[in-house]
């Protein structure tokens, strides 16, 4: 399921009167087969796009919850190539965006790994530690393979950098809702909502917000502020950690996804009524 499909997914969500929901899983946590079944549970709960994390030994952008999942996946021997096998299965029923680090791509060869990702049906890629100024090679290879490169916009992003991102962006832009690393939190600052509005005014592709989005009202607020989608990771991983077995984990993430989708619907309704 590739070929620049991500923007269409956002359009379909809007057509249903809601923002899109992007769910994150760490590949190989708690196992490769379990990752596929959890992805299916997320899809059944209403997740529109799966962000599949490729385990890396130094996940500098990840908070403690996801770092724990990454460590467990690495100890189990999960490789970047295993992740493509999982992506191939998952992309049969939900679009897949890979989340990886620059060293992973470099060590496996940009063209070699991205070509295999395209063959596996991967729709997009997020390189967590790759600024737009250093993205020429990855962007060129991915564009030729019809894989969207998803760029990150942080509170510290300058007007000049956002302009460059706007020129290159496809699929969607990932807005980092705060400084620091990923992780669930209870508050959502007005600065985040202003950041969403600022980015929305400067790019022509969908805008999705992540980092700390964990509750229904978080999703509602960012969609109401103008975001086209919300990205939820740590909250799903926590539900997996709380579970006694994979069946319970599937049920927990499915039910959480359903709740978050309702937040995306409420946020879209609020935004539409104020326009």
From Swiss-Prot:
It catalyses: (1S,2R)-1-C-(indol-3-yl)glycerol 3-phosphate + L-serine = D-glyceraldehyde 3-phosphate + L-tryptophan + H2O. Coiled coil: none annotated. The keyword Transmembrane does not apply. The keyword Coiled coil does not apply. Keywords: Amino-acid biosynthesis, Aromatic amino acid biosynthesis, Lyase, Tryptophan biosynthesis. GO terms for cellular component: cytosol. SUPFAM superfamilies: Ribulose-phoshate binding barrel. Its EC number is 4.2.1.20. GO terms for molecular function: tryptophan synthase activity. It holds the Pfam family Trp_syntA. Pathway: Amino-acid biosynthesis; L-tryptophan biosynthesis; L-tryptophan from chorismate: step 5/5. It is an enzyme of class 4 (lyase). The active site is at residues 51, 62. The alpha subunit is responsible for the aldol cleavage of indoleglycerol phosphate to indole and glyceraldehyde 3-phosphate. Belongs to the TrpA family. This is Tryptophan synthase alpha chain. The gene is trpA.
